[in-house]
Design a protein with these regions (language model features):
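Short, conserved clusters of charged catalytic residues that mark active-site
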Residues: 29, 66, 115, 147-151
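N-terminal hydrophobic or amphipathic helices/low-complexity stretches enriched
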Residues: 1-4
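Catalytic core of membrane glycerolipid acyltransferases/transacylases, capturing the structured
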Residues: 8-15, 20-25, 29, 36-38, ...
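Short gly/ser/thr-rich secondary-structure transition/capping motifs
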Residues: 37-45, 113-114, 171-174
Length: 184
């Protein structure tokens, strides 16, 4: 990841749209390199036709540390922004990169949560898809899904943007919050 730092910094030369799009291309390269280096194979299977010329609200559960690189593999050929928790910006170096590429949400502040929704709508209006984990956090329960927050669904109704559910098969078995990395 640190080898990509100069490329991440390059994205800071541009505005939030172009710079963010560059950042996601770099992250996709990182995802490809990660999967190659670990020997994990990946395949996208669509239940219905996927039109890359349209923007979507992608929704997925978040149950594994492998979910983010998997997202980078799953969403190809279109621009996307992920809704992410603002606390991640406190991580040195990574936090600045994260802030450039994510729509941040402060889950403890209702006003800032509302601003996050407005920011997601802004990107949808710019023809950029958004990725939301409607559980609102990393799922550290024994249940496959936690209760969903309704923000993704309200945004879909308000903007008439289709929701595209994504399922990452076996990521929990490979890199969940309780286990050591396993390639079984």
């Amino acid at each position: 990841m640190f080898l990509l730092l100069p490329f991440f910094l390059y994205s800071f030369l541009f505005d939030e749209i172009k710079g963010g799009n560059i950042l996601y291309k770099i992250c996709r390269f990182w995802g490809d390199a990660f999967f190659f280096a670990t020997g994990i194979s990946h395949r996208n299977i669509y239940e219905e036709e996927h039109d890359r010329s349209k923007q979507y609200i992608f929704v997925s559960n978040h149950i594994s540390y492998l979910d983010i690189p998997m997202m980078m593999k799953a969403i190809r050929g279109q621009h996307v922004r992920i809704l992410g928790k603002s606390e991640m910006t406190r991580v040195p170096i990574f936090g600045s990169i994260y802030k450039k590429g994510a729509v941040l949400v402060d889950r403890e502040n209702a006003g800032k949560r509302l601003q996050s929704i407005k920011n997601l709508i802004y990107f949808l209006n710019k023809k950029i898809s958004v990725f939301i984990c409607p559980e609102g956090t990393f799922n550290m329960t024994n249940q496959p899904l936690k209760n969903f927050y309704d923000g993704a669904f309200k945004i879909a109704i308000q903007t008439q943007t289709p929701i595209k559910p994504i399922l990452f098969l076996d990521t929990y078995d490979r890199l969940n919050y309780r286990s050591i990395f396993s390639l079984n």
